[in-house]
Amino acid sequence: LAPAVVLPKPWADALPKPWRLTLAPSPEEWSPEERERVDLLVMGDGWLDPQAADAWQPIASEPLIRQLDDQARALLDQLGALQSRVLPLAVSPWVMLFRDDQAMAQQGWSLLLDSALAGRVVLPASPRLVMSLADHLGGGNVLNELRRQALTFDDRQATNWLLKGDARLVVLPLNRCIALLRRDPRLRAVLPASGAPLHWTLLLRPEASREPVPQSWVQQGWRDPLRRRLVQLGWRAPIT
């Protein structure tokens, strides 16, 4: 079970039988019954609930865990009781996407607070990710200022807001921008030199699951040639 666009299509297509991918709305809309009917869940890190660790069971895939790089291990270290129950599958930086404007492109994350963009910015729906963006802008009282800049909090429909003209800037993971950038040369995605929050694609095993993680399938996405294909789509394998 995974929301649309969270799992790269070439990787999803490589799922071996009898595994089958079911696409669903965003994680906050998943019912307990839906979670109980599936053996694996894929979601973005913005929707993790550290208070719900009992809903998941340990990943129990030490050969995969040993390969994780420092950034992935740092993520797990922040997850408390969820640490052993989450497997980072892929990572992509958050970027700012807007119609090509050289002046805007040079400002970095501070562009999000530009008064000229008040009410014209689309931010991620996850409060956790909005707080991470605020940290990149200096933290403190910046969070309230950032929220006031928002037209809406809707990364699922962010590109629609931008293309219709209601928004001037949207914040999205790079992997969500690649296809659009190829189709529309008027758009630009900017990854500020100061760095960016990371969007993690995570694998979890519901408490009722009796199926182990399909390790060979995970390894396939972490190794060439599929790994190269995923990089072209804006995803990076979280391994050393």
Where are these regions (language model features)?
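Alpha-to-beta junction loops
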Residues: 18, 34-43, 117-119, 163-172
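A structural signal for short loop-to-beta-strand junctions that line the ligand-binding cleft
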Residues: 38-40, 56-95
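Early extracytoplasmic/lumenal segment of secretory-pathway proteins
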Residues: 1-52
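Flexible hinge/capping segments at coil-to-helix
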Residues: 103-117
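Periplasmic-binding protein-like
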Residues: 120-126, 220-239
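A bilobed periplasmic-binding-protein/Venus flytrap-type ligand-binding module shared by bacterial periplasmic
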Residues: 95-102, 198-214, 229-230
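Short beta-strand->loop
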Residues: 58-68, 86-88, 182-197, 206-207
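Ligand-binding pocket segment of bilobal, Venus flytrap-like solute-binding proteins
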Residues: 45-50, 122-192
